[in-house]
Regions:
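Substrate-positioning beta->alpha
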Residues: 149, 173-188
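N-terminal Rossmann NAD(P)H-binding glycine-rich loop of SDR-like oxidoreductase domains
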Residues: 2-25
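NAD(P)H-binding glycine-rich loop region in Rossmannoid oxidoreductase-like domains
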Residues: 5-6, 17, 37-94
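A conserved pocket-lining segment of Rossmann-fold NAD(P)-dependent short-chain dehydrogenase/reductase
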Residues: 163-177
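Core catalytic loop region at the nicotinamide-binding pocket of NAD(P)H-dependent oxidoreductases
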Residues: 192-215
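Conserved glycine-rich Rossmann-like NAD(P)H-binding loop of the short-chain dehydrogenase/reductase
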Residues: 26-35
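Residues in the short beta-alpha loop(s) of Rossmann-like NAD(P)-binding domains
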Residues: 11, 35-38, 106
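Glycine-/Pro-rich loop/turn segments that contact NAD(P) or position catalytic residues
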Residues: 80-166
Length: 218
């Protein structure tokens, strides 16, 4: 079990839910990194004795390196920019941090069924998709021990934490998954006895039984 984790992009929805979960159910020490966190995070989080808050962007090398110093594992809440991911990889390498979990979008490898793939790419800006693809490529080409979590379409439901893991190369049929389920999946991965299946792996997270042509909430 890890003792020290850094969460990059700590103001994101999944990042905030993960922060709350880790503070409630573990004794981990969290370093939260992102822009304007003092106004975007709840005061209880900002003042928690096991939380260190560092404000900055991914393009601020000194602050970024400060944030990952002493981290045993780093969580990247969004992989949307190749240049940002390159900066993260550089900071982790300089501080000798090897373990990283990053959130990416599903569908970049043609793993969606045709109808869901068409709906997905019809509803996302080309620039966003390109940024996701570039960021993923940067991480995969690094020497880090990464786990890329490929997420289908997201929604919120605190009562629904159902998820399934879809290995790389397997068709990804699930059209949706809750952010709460994603947090549970991350929590479970952090607690596995054998991390081998997650080493330098790309794994999808979906909600079982949601084999739709588009998310049910659209």
């Amino acid at each position: 079990m890890y003792k020290y984790i850094t969460i990059l992009g700590a103001a994101g929805q999944i990042a905030q839910k993960l922060t709350a979960t880790l503070l409630t159910y573990t004794d981990m020490h969290l370093t939260l990194y992102g822009r304007q966190l003092s106004t975007r995070l709840h005061p209880e989080i900002l003042e928690h004795e096991r939380v260190t808050v560092i404000e900055g962007s991914f393009q601020n090398p000194a602050k970024l390196e400060q944030a990952v110093t002493n981290a045993e594992i780093v969580f990247v809440s969004a992989m949307e920019s190749g240049s940002d991911m390159a900066a993260i990889v550089k900071a982790l390498s300089r501080k000798n941090v090897r373990r990283v979990i990053g959130l990416s979008m599903a569908g970049l490898s043609g793993e969606f069924p045709a109808a869901l793939e068409k709906w997905t790419f019809d509803n996302l800006p080309i620039s966003y998709v390109q940024g996701e693809r570039q960021a993923r490529n940067v991480l995969r080409e690094s020497n880090l021990n990464y786990t890329i979590l490929r997420l289908t379409w997201l929604y919120n439901d605190p009562e629904n934490t159902n998820y399934e893991l879809i290995p790389e190369g397997v068709q990804f049929n699930d059209a949706q998954v809750t952010r709460e389920a994603v947090v549970k999946a991350i929590f479970d991965i952090l607690h596995v006895d054998d991390e081998t299946p997650f080493h330098r792996a790309s794994i999808g997270i979906g909600e079982p039984g949601t084999h739709y042509d588009k998310p049910s909430f659209h």
